[in-house]
Amino acid sequence: MLRSLLLRRSNARSLRPPFPPLRTLCTSGQTLTPAPPPPPPPPPPISSSASEKEFRKYAGYAALALFSGAATYFSFPFPENAKHKKAQIFRYAPLPEDLHTVSNWSGTHEVQTRNFNQPETLADLEALVKEAHEKKNRIRPVGSGLSPNGIGLSRSGMVNLALMDKVLEVDKEKKRVRVQAGIRVQQLVDAIQEYGLTLQNFASIREQQIGGIIQVGAHGTGARLPPIDEQVIGMKLVTPAKGTIELSKDNDPELFHLARCGLGGLGVVAEVTLQCVERQELLEHTYVSTLEEIKKNHKKLLSTNKHVKYLYIPYTDTVVVVTCNPVSKWSGAPKDKPKYTTEEALKHVRDLYRESIVKYRVQDSSKKTPDSREPDINELSFTELRDKLIALDPLNDVHVGKVNQAEAEFWKKSEGYRVGWSDEILGFDCGGQQWVSETCFPAGTLAKPSMKDLEYIEQLKELIQKEAIPAPSPIEQRWTGRSKSPMSPAFSTAEEDIFSWVGIIMYLPTADPRQRKDITDEFFHYRHLTQAKLWDQYSAYEHWAKIEIPKDKEELEALQERLRKRFPVDAYNKARRELDPNRILSNNMVEKLFPVSKTA
């Protein structure tokens, strides 16, 4: 699925048809006559003069009403052809043409702004930043909009480098490449493959801009491999207060390491120099195991595989293990053929969908899902089928458990090998729109894993069962080496340290606003439970692209204090004051996570 920044001009929108009137109003000059009371006992006979008096009174009322109506009509005359015109539905005035709507790919965060900038050259960017600094106009750096928490979004204004996407220099001998920060990962990989080069590691998807992927501390998997910011050996930063500065480990190393994972708050990353590796084919092996079996082999799995990840399926004992290693030049790929075809692997999932579709139609024939115009399920991929199954009853833990069991069967029949280039193999189909939370915590060293990574998973699965959380699959667990960037969740001064990254998820498989809100509420309940039970115990901190800002003031203060225990917040804010004193590169999220004292 192509996930890219959703940027669109707002179009004219129609107002809903006017509501039917609740009551008929009188025209100007008319009076509302109250309902007559119940008839009283017959009065004694009255004189004829009294009757005439009453008649004249009511005749006067009638004349007044007629006169008022006529006056109203002639005071506000309609055109002669008015009665022949069709009624027109009232419409709102169209929104301004320069109003841009920008959202992240999950549709969970969205802003509208008139100030959306896309410079084409470094000179354009420098002029933009200089002007914004002088006028104190906010221009928050935003990449491809893939961050689940919308960390790059700002109503006040944004700058996007999608038009600055060139490869500037390739050093084949040193395996280095210098690029503009707006280039997408896949675009870069395609451009340098002719030099026999590629990136050391990849995240799950390829549509991120290079500037964005390093600024939020993104990562791939492999206990010997660091997060992606460690591939950066030089960068050009356009700052509001000091102009364009070049940073490397030899040129202001302290600021260089701080800015590599700088959350877009220290300057706009304009150019990046990356240390690459030789392009190589990988052999991917996917198989099914259990947590008990993994405990016996965990140390070996981490140390002998270049890339490894576990995908846990809640409400089952199934763990999908995926390892990736360079293809041996001598033996090549295994010749074993898969035991099952794709059709056979999907059969159990399709059968559950057919069964569920009938069940939910019987239970509620008025329900909008499933749609009467269902697509041919034989044309749907596994992740598409999973989305449609979950959409039937996303908050029912029993139903979601059945979907997970069907997924376990799918993976058991999908075991096997696959060979491809690293940028093809290391990707992962994350499914449709979703809420996700991912934490990072220390897991010992490669030589001596602490096993706390597996303990974390055990407690998480027990929590899901105990609280009856409708937790879909997968719980994804990956590993990286340490990062030397102080703002990285995987920062460490010890070279041998390894870190585990665990992601939980809830899909948003529907466009219905009420259902999406219900799923959102349930996800944040799920996330809150993991936070309360696990984060402090394991020193776990959220991925910067997945952290969410609490609405409660006390919870926000607790989060700010917690971040101070792990990250050099004072040093980060000091650099912000020096490089961006007017905080034009900030947004609401950065301001709340790292409040800057006005007296500092």
Curated annotation (Swiss-Prot):
Cellular compartment(s): Mitochondrion membrane
Cofactor: FAD
FAD-binding PCMH-type domain segment(s): 108-279
Segment forming the signal sequence: none
Protein's pathway: Cofactor biosynthesis; L-ascorbate biosynthesis
Membrane-crossing residue ranges in chain numbering: 58-74
GO CC annotation: mitochondrial membrane
Residue ranges listed under propeptide: 26-91
Transit peptide range per the UniProt entry: 1-25
Region of interest (Disordered), ranges: 16-51
Catalyzed reaction equations: L-galactono-1,4-lactone + 4 Fe(III)-[cytochrome c] = L-dehydroascorbate + 4 Fe(II)-[cytochrome c] + 5 H(+)
Bilayer topology annotation: Single-pass membrane protein
GO MF, any single term: D-arabinono-1,4-lactone oxidase activity
Class of enzymatic activity (EC top level): oxidoreductase
Xref: InterPro entries: ALO_C, FAD-bd_PCMH, FAD-bd_PCMH-like_sf, FAD-bd_PCMH_sub1, FAD-bd_PCMH_sub2, FAD_lactone_oxidase-like, GL_DH, Oxid_FAD_bind_N
EC number(s) recorded for this UniProt protein: 1.3.2.3
Primary localization class, coarse: mitochondrion
Regulation (activators, inhibitors): Inhibited by sulfhydryl-modifying agents such as N-ethylmaleimide, monoiodoacetic acid and p-hydroxymercuribenzoic acid. No inhibition by riboflavin and lycorine.
PROSITE patterns in the cross-refs: FAD_PCMH
Biased composition (Pro residues): 34-46
Keyword entries, A-Z: Membrane, Mitochondrion, Oxidoreductase, Transit peptide, Transmembrane, Transmembrane helix
PANTHER family in alphabetical order: D-ARABINONO-1,4-LACTONE OXIDASE, L-GULONOLACTONE OXIDASE
UniProt comment concerning the protein's domains: The FAD-binding PCMH-type domain does not bind FAD covalently.
Name assigned to this protein: L-galactono-1,4-lactone dehydrogenase, mitochondrial
Lineage, highest ranks first: Eukaryota, Viridiplantae, Streptophyta, Embryophyta, Tracheophyta
